[in-house]
């Protein structure tokens, strides 16, 4: 076992050095802000006991996510990464936050719960699919140990058709690119070879649309992402069901993607994971999976008192006087249900909690609908609109003094 761990450390060191040698400044994804991640968890009945959350970024890179999250919680923030230069940058950008931020340059294999403590929210983004399988298993076990009950983790991964399309090209590139050359030179050589391949495909005249789209996507990636997705021999597409199976033994279960998939109302985590994989193999994609440490994730419900509902839709009545709600794109939602119309009219003006919406809508339909019917219709509509990305649920706990005003 000692020999195996030594070998894994050598691979990890090589991965870290590649980040040190190729400049990398990742984009921050706004959907990963705690209010949206914890809002998704609340939809499945996962509740936080406190507004103050402690956050761990396992693979923090240059600290962009830590810096962003710092303004959203007064809790403890810990970031770990293999890359020394990335950790130095992360420490620089968070130095004004004082001792509540702790950035560590350390191997996953050297971390444990006693060292780190426990957290309410863990990010494991851009990491799980570029490390050896044994290290990934160790990282997932560490995540499960470090999550508090009710804690949530975001894990990003590639799944579906695009990684499969590129598998042959990835193998060919690794075979023809000299791995002893500096990482930057390897990337340049590989990009040139891919450009040649794309040119050949365009001249061939066959139906190569999916492959050409995948190659164009690669051309837009920064050098570090390109290196690890094409030349790193540890790169592995992952399945949602595989992650669920590995984490579920520790009581951590798949909820949904941060951009919800069409499986949100399934009650069992493994059922959601299996459908997620089926969807991925139909269209492929880079996923942000949200998992929570809970006994069992409940069926999705909009009724949590900790959720503030909002929408970007605005009302535009069409030529026939019918209510149409648009978000600025060409796609608009035509509404025929008067309760749904009232719901969207309210949300398009300002955010509401479920109990407030229920009271307002019930008042509009007094004498025509029972409050229990309004409750059922609102819950169904909000969940349906959320699953289509037309409304959003922001985690914003009710202040303790008024927490008893939530719905039954």
Question: Model-derived features: where do they sit?
Answer:
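Conserved alpha-helix/loop element of class I SAM-dependent methyltransferases that forms part
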Residues: 30-53
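Conserved SAM-binding strand-loop segment of SAM-dependent methyltransferases
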Residues: 98-110
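Long, charge-rich, low-complexity alpha-helical segments
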Residues: 84, 265-291, 332-408
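Conserved SAM-binding loop of SAM-dependent methyltransferases across substrates and taxa
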Residues: 62-73
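Conserved class I S-adenosyl-L-methionine
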Residues: 154-181, 189, 193, 197-203
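A short acidic, Gly/Pro-enriched loop at the edge of an enzyme's catalytic core
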Residues: 113-122
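A short glycine-rich, Lys/Arg-flanked "PGG" loop and its adjoining helix->strand segment in the class I
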Residues: 137-149
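Conserved SAM-binding motif I beta-strand of class I
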Residues: 76-81
């Amino acid at each position: 076992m000692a020999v195996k761990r030594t070998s894994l450390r050598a691979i990890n060191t090589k991965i870290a050095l590649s980040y040190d040698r190729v400049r990398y400044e990742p984009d921050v994804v706004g959907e990963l802000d705690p209010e949206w991640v914890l809002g998704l968890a609340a939809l499945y009945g996962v509740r936080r006991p406190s507004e103050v959350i402690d956050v761990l970024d396992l693979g923090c890179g240059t600290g962009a996510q830590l810096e962003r999250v710092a303004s959203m919680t007064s809790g403890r923030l810990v970031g770990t990464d293999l890359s020394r230069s990335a950790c130095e940058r992360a420490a620089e950008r968070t130095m004004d936050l004082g001792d509540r931020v702790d950035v560590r340059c350390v191997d996953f294999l050297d971390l444990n719960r006693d060292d780190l403590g426990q957290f309410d929210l863990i990010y494991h983004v851009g990491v799980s699919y570029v490390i050896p399988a044994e290290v990934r298993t160790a990282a997932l076990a560490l995540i499960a140990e470090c999550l508090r009950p009710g804690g949530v983790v975001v894990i990003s991964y590639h799944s579906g058709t695009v990684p499969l399309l590129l598998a042959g090209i990835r193998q060919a590139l690794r075979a023809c690119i000299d791995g002893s050359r500096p990482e930057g030179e390897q990337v340049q050589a590989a990009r040139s070879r891919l450009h040649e391949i794309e040119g050949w495909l365009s001249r061939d005249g066959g139906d190569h649309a999916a492959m050409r789209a995948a190659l164009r996507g690669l051309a837009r990636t920064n050098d570090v992402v390109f290196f690890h997705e094409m030349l790193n021999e540890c790169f592995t597409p992952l399945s949602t069901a595989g992650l669920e199976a590995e984490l579920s033994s520790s009581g951590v279960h798949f909820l949904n993607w941060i951009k919800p998939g069409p499986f949100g109302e399934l009650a069992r985590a493994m059922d959601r994971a299996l459908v997620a994989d089926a969807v991925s193999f139909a269209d492929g994609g880079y996923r942000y999976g949200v998992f929570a440490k809970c006994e069992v994730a409940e069926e999705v419900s909009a009724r949590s008192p900790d959720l503030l509902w909002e929408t970007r839709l605005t009302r535009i009545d069409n030529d026939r006087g019918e209510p149409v709600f648009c978000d600025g794109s060409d796609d608009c939602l035509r509404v025929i249900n008067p309760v749904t119309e009232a719901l969207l009219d309210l949300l398009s003006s300002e955010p509401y909690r479920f109990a407030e919406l229920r009271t307002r809508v019930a008042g509009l339909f007094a004498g025509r609908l029972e409050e229990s019917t309004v409750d059922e219709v609102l819950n169904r509509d909000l969940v349906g609109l959320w699953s289509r990305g037309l409304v959003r649920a922001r985690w914003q706990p009710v202040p303790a003094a008024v927490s008893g005003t939530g719905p039954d």
